[in-house]
Amino acid sequence: MGKTVVRSNESLDDALRRFKRSVSKAGTIQEYRKREFYEKPSVKRKLKSEAARKRKKF
């Protein structure tokens, strides 16, 4: 999880923006959404092969 310390003379909006950026760079939100629901191993393999096929197409 991202950690942000509010600097002196920094608005809360700026600190929140820095926090959101750090969380985004760390991939926390994407990881949460990926693990929100259980995926069977067969479904994971299917999605992985579809993603590879899509990458190869372009």
UniProtKB/Swiss-Prot annotation:
PROSITE patterns: RIBOSOMAL_S21
Keywords: Ribonucleoprotein, Ribosomal protein
Pfam assignment, any one: Ribosomal_S21
Organism expressing this protein natively: Latilactobacillus sakei subsp. sakei (strain 23K)
Family statement drawn from the similarity comment of this UniProt entry: Belongs to the bacterial ribosomal protein bS21 family.
GO MF terms held by the record: structural constituent of ribosome
InterPro entries on file: Ribosomal_bS21, Ribosomal_bS21_CS, Ribosomal_bS21_sf
GO biological process: translation
One cellular-component annotation, GO: ribosome
Protein name: Small ribosomal subunit protein bS21
Presence of keyword Ribosomal protein: yes
